[in-house]
Amino acid sequence: MDHLPVRSITAMQDYIETHLHEPITLHQLAKVSGYSPYHAAHLFKQALGISPLTYWRKCRLSAAALELRDAQDPILSIALEYQFDSHECFTRAFASQFGLSPSTYRKLSPPIPIFRPFRYGPNRPQGVASMTKTTPIFIQLIQRPARACIVRRAKTATEYFQYCDEVGCDVWGVLGSVKEALGEPMGLWLPEAFRPQGTSKYVQGVEVPLDYQKPLPEGYELMKLPAQTFMVFQGEPYNDECFGDAIEALQTAIKAYDPAVVGYRKDPNGPCFQLEPRGERGYIEAIAVTKNKN
């Protein structure tokens, strides 16, 4: 799909995501894309697999769900804020997307498949050079106490794209909806001790307190993790269209780095993790380490 007009498609995405509280028409999207309403809608669906108005509805419902979870405003106020005409209209749309009513979700706040707007764009567009220059990397040590982790396993995946091929790309949205999460969702590479037979090395999960007891969606499980020291590597901010290069550059640096220079060594018994690649903060990945014995 590299032939599609990336800037026009992302301009429509940006417009939708910054106008969740306002009515949107195809004519408005056509104006920001530079194409006719028909052609703009066709390009959007060809690139992202759904129509722009469906994309807008999913974004509105997901934003409203997080507000239901975290705020105390009346359900009707939230419905009207996100351009639903009535409590009944909002309830029908909410139940259709998430499988439960807004009131039930507010009361129980179970994990639900929050829609995560994904940025359209090829990994390395034509005319964009690979990131070959040396860039600074920030390294820090962090301590994680014993905790649990809600995970969704695959069968054979060793990295993100294989994982999405096996289980789909909705897992991150479910993990991001967990109210009790101790941090943001992450991709994890698990050592054998954390992998039941026939399951993948790469999984996605989110850390929660050890006493987490809410029901889990089908296919998810609760995995306990012991206290662990991590060495976290963070690259410089990058253009989102170059996320593949940013990941490759940081992973190459991690392989070349020797933790012994600060008195540590890699811990093969601990998981490694990656956070969502976001250009404005740089790519972040961490390895498990343990302190060298004197």
Regions found by a protein language model. Name each.
Residues M1, H42-L48:
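Short, Lys/Arg-enriched N-terminal segment that forms or immediately precedes the first helix
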Residues M1-T10:
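Short, charge-enriched, intrinsically disordered boundary segments that mark the beginning
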Residues T10, D14-H27, Q46-Y82, L108-A129:
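Terminal helix-turn-helix DNA-binding modules in bacterial transcription factors
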Residues T25-F44, D70-R106:
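Sequence-specific DNA-binding recognition helix
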Residues R69, E88, R92-N294:
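A solvent-exposed interaction/effector surface
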